[in-house]
Amino acid sequence: MAKTAMAYKEKMKELSMLSLICSCFYPEPRNINIYTYDDMEVKQINKRASGQAFELILKPPSPISEAPRTLASPKKKDLSLEEIQKKLEAAEGRRKSQEAQVLKQLAEKREHEREVLQKALEENNNFSKMAEEKLILKMEQIKENREANLAAIIERLQEKERHAAEVRRNKELQVELSG
């Protein structure tokens, strides 16, 4: 059973889907390396993992076949001056219409570029304002912290000065009392 399944898998790898379907209808084996059409023959030269190569053989034309037909171009009718003038006016109208369309597209493109530039400028201005506001706020906070630190230092110095004055007074009192 396993051998049959392996053989079936190998056959499936070798056959194309079209060959597989055809083998259901035509059980006799066919040469899958040669395909013939009305006026050409295709031979498979080699089959590799990287791709396939084919040889295309064109059959010579048979003497029975009809002579090649040449398509006759429609006869040009003589154009009157009015028809020529109408065609020229229509062409001029098309040219002007195309020019107007190109100008409209350019105007739309410039408008879009202007809008994008305006938006970028607004965003830049907003960013600058926000950065400036943050900087001012930070500077104010630093100033307040500095003033608070200075006030604390001054308070400590005054406290030390008061303590030193009290120590001196106590020493003087001690000297007076003992002396």
Curated annotation (Swiss-Prot):
Pfam families: Stathmin. GO terms for biological process: cellular response to nerve growth factor stimulus; microtubule depolymerization; negative regulation of microtubule depolymerization; negative regulation of microtubule polymerization; negative regulation of neuron projection development; neuron projection development; positive regulation of microtubule depolymerization; positive regulation of neuron projection development. It is found in: Cytoplasm; Cytoplasm, Perinuclear region; Cell projection, Growth cone; Cell projection, Axon. Changing residue 62 to A: Partial loss of phosphorylation. Complete loss of phosphorylation by MAPK8, increased microtubule solubility, and reduced neurite length. Induction: By nerve growth factor. It comes from the Eukaryota. Expressed in neurons (at protein level). Present in growth cones and abundant in developing neurons. Residues 39-96 are annotated as: Regulatory/phosphorylation domain. Residues 1-26 are annotated as: Membrane attachment. A lipid is attached at residues 22, 24 (S-palmitoyl cysteine). Its main location: cytoplasm. Residues 75-179 form a coiled coil. GO terms for cellular component: cytoplasm; endosome; Golgi apparatus; growth cone; lamellipodium; membrane; neuron projection; neuronal cell body. PANTHER family: STATHMIN (PTHR10104), STATHMIN-2 (PTHR10104:SF18). Regulator of microtubule stability. When phosphorylated by MAPK8, stabilizes microtubules and consequently controls neurite length in cortical neurons. In the developing brain, negatively regulates the rate of exit from multipolar stage and retards radial migration from the ventricular zone. Belongs to the stathmin family. This is Stathmin-2.
